[in-house]
From Swiss-Prot:
Gene responsible for this protein: SPACA3
GO molecular function: lysozyme activity
UniProt keyword Secreted, yes or no: yes
Name of the protein in question: Sperm acrosome membrane-associated protein 3
InterPro entries assigned to the protein according to its UniProt record, in alphabetical order: Glyco_hydro_22, Glyco_hydro_22_CS, Glyco_hydro_22_lys, Lysozyme-like_dom_sf
Similarity-based family: Belongs to the glycosyl hydrolase 22 family.
Entry keyword set: Disulfide bond, Secreted, Signal
Intrachain disulfide bonds: 41-161, 65-149, 99-114, 110-128
Keyword Signal: yes
Example of a GO cellular component annotation carried by this entry: sperm flagellum
Domain of life: Eukaryota
Cell compartment(s), UniProt: Secreted
Organism field: Canis lupus familiaris
Length: 163
């Protein structure tokens, strides 16, 4: 019987993709250790402390509803889109326009890394969300808000919260 020799038939992954995969994994591990899932009342209180009540005409209930339907109140939520962009943090802010991921050619309107949007203290997230809300669409920039929150009675989202 003839012995077979094993030799790689070429690269299984394009050059640099292993480094990209490792960096992504490392980023996930670092941010997941800081993950926080807020309760609706905890989130409402934090957003109130940041001055979000009434910002651009939106209530705390609007923001809490948005956070629930985008991330389930999870600060470390990251969703990968087919175009390679990511939705990041409790409000699922997209890297296509608002924050900097690995692609350096994006506008980065919020002037921050997308990983900054995963921080449980929410400071960077609130700053970026305020910039998004300054756009003509306001909270309607988020499909989840249009679909689940817009035009609805949202009082239950903050009902019983000590604000």
């Amino acid at each position: 019987m003839e012995a077979r020799s094993w030799a790689p038939r070429g690269h299984l992954c394009p050059p640099g993709s292993m480094l990209l995969a490792f960096a992504s994994l490392l980023g996930c591990l670092l941010t997941s250790s800081q993950a926080r899932v807020y309760s609706r009342c905890e989130l409402a209180k934090v957003l109130q402390d940041f001055g979000m009540e009434g910002y651009r005409g939106y209530t705390l209930a609007d923001w809490v509803c948005l956070a629930y339907f985008t991330s389930g109140f999870n600060t470390a939520a990251v969703d990968h889109e087919a175009d390679g962009s990511t939705n990041n943090g409790i409000f699922q802010i997209n890297s296509r326009k608002w924050c900097k991921n690995l692609n350096t050619e994006v506008p980065n309107v919020c002037q921050m890394y997308c990983s900054d949007l995963l921080n449980p203290n929410l400071k960077d997230t609130v700053i970026c969300a305020m910039k998004i809300t300054q756009q003509p669409q306001g909270l309607a920039s988020w499909e989840a808000w249009r679909r689940h929150c817009q035009g609805k009675d949202l009082t239950d989202w903050v009902d019983g919260c000590d604000l």
